């Protein structure tokens, strides 16, 4: 598991990233937002980003959802 930090509304919050190689999925959790998602590890960069945007857009403004999804996508693909 990788723990990253995200700047959100003048706060630093923890983001937990886990890749299960055996079952081919990513688990991403941001407890301070009461949010988590499971993504198929077979998705490409664009698909990961789009899925994250859709998930985040349900409770974040569009610009915030885009910013957070972009950062999460970078972390997922670099780890």
Predicted segments, located by residue:
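Negatively charged, low-complexity tracts enriched in Asp/Glu with abundant Ser/Thr
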Residues: 1-16, 50-59
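A general, composition-driven signal for non-globular sequence regions
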Residues: 1-3, 13, 36-39, 45, ...
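A short, structured beta-strand/loop element
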Residues: 20-45
């Amino acid at each position: 598991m990788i723990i990253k930090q995200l700047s959100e509304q003048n706060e630093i919050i923890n983001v937990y990233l886990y890749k299960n190689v055996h079952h081919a999925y990513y688990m991403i959790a941001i407890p301070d937002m009461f949010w988590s998602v499971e993504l198929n590890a077979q998705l490409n960069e664009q698909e990961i980003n789009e899925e994250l945007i859709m998930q985040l857009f349900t409770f974040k403004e569009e610009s915030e959802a885009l910013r957070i999804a972009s950062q999460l996508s970078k972390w997922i693909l670099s780890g």
